[in-house]
């Protein structure tokens, strides 16, 4: 609910300007690492708001900002490959933190399209 309230307050709700991005993609919900540590795919900690093409233009966001829309197959593959080698919950938390920073501020650190 907090995410919706934030979008409403900022004038973003149902305007097609932003979309919620699952940091660990939903396709990995049954991955052994995700299941082993009981990672909640729908928790707010697994979501980041990313602009759409329309949002990037209207909100006048910085150049290089990741755009959410369509598929991001390279990202999903990358996340799956890293999940394959994670052995501790601490590693999983560190990886999700790394992905959040990559999605928001350092897109050069993660593959996208």
What spans do the regions from the language model cover?
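Catalytic toxin/effector domains delivered as secreted proteins or via bacterial secretion systems
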Residues: 1-113
